[in-house]
From Swiss-Prot:
Protein family according to the UniProt entry: Belongs to the MurCDEF family. MurE subfamily.
Pathway membership, UniProt: Cell wall biogenesis; peptidoglycan biosynthesis
Protein name: UDP-N-acetylmuramoyl-L-alanyl-D-glutamate--2,6-diaminopimelate ligase
GO molecular function per UniProt: ATP binding; magnesium ion binding; UDP-N-acetylmuramoylalanyl-D-glutamate-2,6-diaminopimelate ligase activity
PANTHER family the record matches: MUR LIGASE FAMILY MEMBER, UDP-N-ACETYLMURAMOYL-L-ALANYL-D-GLUTAMATE--2,6-DIAMINOPIMELATE LIGASE MURE HOMOLOG, CHLOROPLASTIC
Entry binding sites for meso-2,6-diaminopimelate: 409, 433-436, 483, 487
GO cellular component, one term: cytoplasm
Organism domain of life: Bacteria
Alphabetical keyword list: ATP-binding, Cell cycle, Cell division, Cell shape, Cell wall biogenesis/degradation, Cytoplasm, Ligase, Magnesium, Nucleotide-binding, Peptidoglycan synthesis
Binding sites annotated in the UniProt record for UDP-N-acetyl-alpha-D-muramoyl-L-alanyl-D-glutamate: 33, 158-159, 185, 191, 193
Native source organism of the sequence: Nitrosomonas europaea (strain ATCC 19718 / CIP 103999 / KCTC 2705 / NBRC 14298)
Cited NCBIfam families: murE, PRK00139.1-4
Length: 521
């Protein structure tokens, strides 16, 4: 069978031309050879960690109907008797090819992309919840999975590969979705997974240190995030103007053919670039308790107040970002506020367990220096409020932190994590996170380099660390279990073992409870 090649990297018309050259009926595209079924069309890209062209014999054996393969540095073997097409730069073209094959699903969805170091998951989930409350069926794709609020399926990556992403959008469109919100990770943006998707709204939460093992520098990391805001056809850019990158982007986008909604609490009017395409959502009078966040908002000379049953100071920024995204989605301010009042806490994001006659235990995904600083600062402020109202057995309540760092990731942040934990918590236990292929003890030692004081100890076994932290706490204390959030596995030496911080916490609290006590949360 004849093999054809293409060197062009152009628009969707070229994608259609490529599929026509293949001369087979493409019903189901797959880029992951492990998921191939008879009749599928296989896209064999040359990835950074895995070259899928090595899987071509396996794909043929599985009964695929054709193969599109990366042409550069590879030759098709004559014994492979199957329709095929060699394409130079296939990773860049994959999303456009898949979009063409699945009927350009993003054109028929209001597509919202959320990027930033922290807050992507919470913002995407809350946007989907709020839109659902407004009667607009909205799908969501991200760290917690993909699907619809309350019915998510596990995801291997925060941002799926370009082919699977187009398939998911087509499925959600078929299921009646009118909108889709997704987390746009820096890896996904750098690896062209979003090409072929037509975004209506792009949202920036923040930019702090993370993934420097991949991006090498903060400038490269910021550049990856910024790509989303220069997306062809983008209608709205929602920017955090309390962030340096947000201000820079607002200045670069001023006068462009799109609308900007800047948001913030720190007088964003003063930092915003004056331009006809920019509006400001300003939050003020922020108040929070252990149960609720409240603040006032101003937008285009309209005023409203928002109270929401979530906790954590940084969640105020998440709420403001989601409100701005709803406004960009043509939702009236009052309707958006009403919908946001109904959002629910996200699993593993400031998830509260215990309380009552037991210590309060918070499970959170915070795994970057900035996120840990924000969470501990907020909990410290909450604890201070508790101390003002009452004393616990004549002694002040404590803030206890269990934290670790992942293996095979940015080593430079490890001592920073240790420093922040030791400065803001009364007791710290440094433990394992996902050690992956590293020795957990070595990771802990690097975290401990930044920690100081006798209140900082270590425990390699994460379960033992959680037990020790909660057993050492009393009624009125707060215990933060940070780093893994709602993850349901722990990766050790290339294997993933079932593990859930929340289940461990529930078991400890159950063991501690007397016959008359019930675990709360």
């Amino acid at each position: 069978m004849m093999s054809t090649s293409s060197d062009s990297r152009s628009d969707e018309g070229h994608a259609a031309c490529l599929l026509n050259q293949l001369d087979v009926k493409v019903r189901h595209l797959v880029a992951d050879s492990r998921k191939l079924k008879p009749g599928d069309t296989f896209l064999a890209c040359a990835g950074e960690r895995h070259d899928a062209r090595n899987d071509i014999p396996q794909a043929i054996a599985r009964g695929v109907n054709a193969i599109i393969w990366e042409k550069q540095g590879f030759s098709w073997k004559p014994e492979w008797k199957i329709p095929n097409l060699g394409v130079a730069g296939l990773r860049h073209e994959a999303g456009k090819i898949a979009s063409e094959a699945y009927g350009h699903p993003s054109r028929h969805l209001w597509l919202v992309g959320i990027t930033g170091t922290n807050g992507k998951t919470t913002c995407s989930q809350w946007y989907a919840q709020a839109m659902a409350a407004l009667g607009k069926k909205t799908a969501v794709i991200g760290t917690l999975g993909h699907g619809f609020p309350g019915a998510l399926y596990p995801s291997e990556h925060t941002t799926p590969d370009a082919v699977y992403l187009q398939q998911l959008m087509a499925e959600y469109l078929h299921q009646g979705a009118s909108s889709l919100v997704m987390e746009a990770s820096s890896h996904g943006l750098s690896q062209d997974r979003l090409i072929g998707s037509e975004f209506a709204v792009a949202v920036l939460t923040n930019l702090t240190r993370d993934h420097l093992d991949y991006h090498d520098s903060m400038d490269a990391y910021a550049a990856a995030k910024a790509k989303l805001f220069f997306w062809e056809g983008l209608q709205y850019a929602v920017l955090n103007l309390d962030e340096v990158l947000g201000v820079e982007l607002s200045q670069q986008l001023a006068g462009k053919d799109l609308s900007i909604i800047g948001y913030g609490f720190k007088q964003p009017r003063q930092t915003a670039q004056t331009a006809g395409n920019q509006k400001i959502l300003y939050g003020s009078n922020l108040q929070f308790t252990t149960q609720q966040i409240g603040f006032d908002v101003e937008f285009c000379n309209r005023y409203a107040s928002l109270q929401c049953n979530v906790t954590g100071r940084y969640n105020a920024y998440n709420l403001l970002a989601v409100l701005a995204a709803l406004l960009a989605s043509n939702i009236d301010l009052d309707d958006a506020i009403t919908a946001l009042r109904q959002v629910q806490p996200i699993p593993g994001r400031m998830e509260k367990l215990g309380g009552g006659n037991q210590p309060v235990v918070i499970v959170d995904y915070a795994h970057t220096p900035d996120a840990l600083n924000e969470v501990l600062t907020g909990l410290r402020e909450t604890l201070a409020g508790t101390r003002i109202k009452k004393r616990i057995r004549k002694n002040q309540a404590k803030l206890i932190c269990v934290i670790g760092c992942g293996g095979d990731r940015d080593r430079g942040k490890r001592p920073l994590i240790g420093e922040i934990a030791s400065r803001l918590a009364d007791e710290v236990i440094i433990t394992s996170d996902n050690p992956r292929n590293e020795n957990p003890a070595d990771i802990i030692s690097e975290v401990m380099l930044g920690a100081s004081g006798k209140h900082c100890t270590s425990e390699v076994d994460r379960t033992a660390a959680i037990y020790r932290a909660i057993h050492g706490a009393r009624k009125g204390d707060i215990v933060l279990i940070a780093g893994k959030g709602a993850e349901t596995s722990q990766e050790i030496q290339g294997k993933k073992y079932p593990y859930d911080d929340r289940e461990v916490v529930r078991q400890v609290l159950h063991d501690l409870a007397g016959p008359e006590l019930q675990v709360q949360g």
